[in-house]
UniProtKB/Swiss-Prot annotation:
Lineage: Bacteria, Bacillati, Bacillota, Bacilli, Bacillales
Cellular component aspect of the GO annotation: plasma membrane
Official protein name in the record: UPF0344 protein GWCH70_0687
Organism of derivation: Geobacillus sp. (strain WCH70)
Keyword field contains tRNA processing: no
TM regions (residue ranges): 2-22, 32-52, 55-75, 97-117
Main localisation: membrane
Localization in the cell: Cell membrane
The organism's place on the tree of life at top rank: Bacteria
InterPro entries xref list: UPF0344
Membership in a protein family: Belongs to the UPF0344 family.
Any Pfam family matching the protein: DUF1516
Keywords of this entry: Cell membrane, Membrane, Transmembrane, Transmembrane helix
Membrane topology: Multi-pass membrane protein
Amino acid sequence: MTHAHITSWLITVILFFIAVSLQRSGASKAKIVQMALRLFYIFTVITGGLLLHSIASISILYIIKAIVGLWLIGAMEMVLSGMKKGKNTNVAWIQWIVAFVLVLFLGFMLPLGFDLF
């Protein structure tokens, strides 16, 4: 299940940057990519929930990682919707960067992740 989760969030991040670039260029396919991105949000949340459910003793750090992961998805949506409306997205980008760094740090630090830290 770990590999499915890593694959889903990796595809989610790639689709996010594709959606951002299409949104900036004003391409008509941006809406299709955003719908695919939202589908991968669901895959990421489901696989993350299944991973969380499979842990015998859940540390508070896993709960924090899940909350930060949901925050990251929210930040992605704030960036894309702000760009679509033509608003300033600096705050949303800062939130995205902070949440992304936190979720990666927690993901790699916890026992189900890789031994990077």
